[in-house]
Structures are given as C-alpha cells and as structure tokens.
From Swiss-Prot:
Record family assignment: Belongs to the eukaryotic ribosomal protein eS27 family.
Organism placement in taxonomy: Archaea, Thermoproteota, Thermoprotei, Thermoproteales, Thermoproteaceae
Quaternary state and interactors: Part of the 30S ribosomal subunit.
Keyword S-adenosyl-L-methionine found: no
Protein name: Small ribosomal subunit protein eS27
One GO cellular component term noted in the UniProt record for this chain: ribosome
Cofactor(s) needed for function: Zn(2+)
Gene3D superfamilies hit by this protein: Zn-binding ribosomal proteins
Residues that bind Zn(2+): 22, 25, 41, 44
GO biological process entries: translation
MF terms in GO: structural constituent of ribosome; zinc ion binding
Pfam family, one: Ribosomal_S27e
Amino acid sequence: MPARFGKTLIPQPRSRFIKVRCPDCGNEQVTFSHAAMVVRCLVCGRVLAQPTGGKARLAGHVIKVLE
C-alpha cells in the first residue's frame, strides 16, 4: 500500500451502550442501543426499550452514550 494513503481505516460499530433514565421512578440503568429483548426498569418494571429489528425504541430519557 502506498504511503500516501496513511492509516488503514477500520470500521467502528454503530451500536453503543447507553444510560437511560426511567420517566416514572428516575432510576438510571445501562442498556444496549440495539437491544434484542424488552428492557424493563429494575425498580418499577416499566418498559424502557423495545426491540424493532434494528435500534431499540426507547421509552426512557437517554442520559449518556457510553464509549
């Protein structure tokens, strides 16, 4: 590979871990952005994320995207 191309590009994953706050009780918990199962709040049991075949549909508020 010629020197003018520089570094080899490595694809980064589009999925992330995210911290979500429950709108009912205020509990914060970490979930996966592409969750394949229903994610419920550990305190009150409300559904925070529903799978859609791609990215999960979030019902809570995203606080932080973890790297």
